[in-house]
Amino acid sequence: MGLVGDMDMTDNMMIRSYRNGKGPFLDRKGPRALAEKIKDQLEVMTPSISAPVRQMSGGNVQKVLVGREIAQNPKVLLVAFPTRGVDINTSHVIYQLLNEQKKKGVAVVCVIEDLDVVLELLSLIHI
């Protein structure tokens, strides 16, 4: 599930929890705290978590997306070209996040075209 460009970080965090909501009122405290945590931990460059994500660079959008999905504590994480179009520093951050998930026992399924990254990041390769 992607991000909505006209929505801010908090609203994009809430996308994953709309179906769990009770009634027409949604709790924004948890998603706001998650947005702040992702912004700080992944060094997302944005003037505010209230700014629309379309105003962010591609690398920062990727950080928000990967951070949101990892925050769901998945058992399986499927990513396709997670660093396409991002700068080298952001790609290292994203690969580090995926590696941390692998160490936690999460099955990380990747579609990646860079063989060096594949050999460094993954423990099982299918071609």
Give residue ranges: language-model regions.
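Glycine-rich phosphate-binding loops of nucleotide-dependent enzymes
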Residues: M1-I125
